[in-house]
Amino acid sequence: MVSKRQRVLLEVIQELINNNIRSRVYLFKSLFLLDKEYGLNIGFDFHPYKFGPYSIVIDREINKLIKNNYIRKEGNFYKVNKCGKLSNDSIKQIINKFKSQRQILEYVYENYPFFASRSEKIARKKEQIKKGLFDIGYEKKSIDLFISLLLINNINCLIDVRYNAFSMNFDYTKKKLKKYLNDRGVEYLHLKELGINGSLRKSLELEEDYKLLFKNYKKSLKYKQELLNIVISKSKEEGTAIMCFEKDNKFCHRGVIAKELTRQGIGVTAI
């Protein structure tokens, strides 16, 4: 059985084929506009990449559809093996709105300039490097939303302060995350020594448990100034973010790091 977003994906691919359009670029831009302008909330986030708005998750869903024989590769596009009747008129409207791939690209680039900021199709202006320090948690964030937040805040270096750079969401495992970021011009650093060993987190239940853990962690930071200096140095060179899991930094040791760096005169902005 296909999910709601897989169903929409199938229908968009089929409607493109019906209109003799076989273009991945057109596919991604159509899905982007369905979300932004037609309110078709299908659970995809986007970030700026080589040809405008792109989604890692969409490509993953396409691969699932291929694996389950709903679609198959045909040249540079796809052939639909299984698809029901078109269930949303918005899909037909968005595809019929543009006469060519160039037209839909120009429309997206003009109306959503942030998503065109990394495009290979337009000349990129040399931007002044923006410096500063941020903190971010990836909890409940798709990898596409996470990357988008980094780029919109002009972050060029991500410092991972997890003890173990592993996640049940495999997009945030060290190897994958580093590749995603490097491909988009963002440096990745893993400062394991600024993390907290997972064994110390096992019994955390109450707010008091967190307070005790972070109280002890704060004491340990006086022995880790060399590592903090790396963070400080990076933030003075370019936009830099420290990252861990928790959405709210009050429940994450990166919040303790942020407070310590603020005490040392380095402002930290939470994303």
Locations of regions flagged by a protein language model:
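Domain-edge interaction signal
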Residues: M1-E139, I152, T262-R263, G267
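Acidic, metal-coordinating catalytic cores used for nucleic-acid/nucleotide bond scission
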Residues: K50-Y54, N164-K174, G195-N197, E246-H253
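A conditional alpha-helix N-cap/helix-loop micro-motif detector
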Residues: E139-I143, F170, S220-L228
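Acidic beta-strand-to-loop metal/phosphate-binding motif
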Residues: C157-N164, G239-K247
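A short beta-strand-loop structural module common to alpha/beta enzyme folds
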Residues: C157-S167, H190-L194, A270-I271
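Short, surface-exposed acidic-centric catalytic microdomains
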Residues: M168-E208
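Internal catalytic-core helix/loop-beta-alpha segment
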Residues: L206-A241, F251
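Short Gly/Thr/Asp-enriched flexible loops that form oxyanion-binding sites at enzyme active sites
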Residues: F251-T262
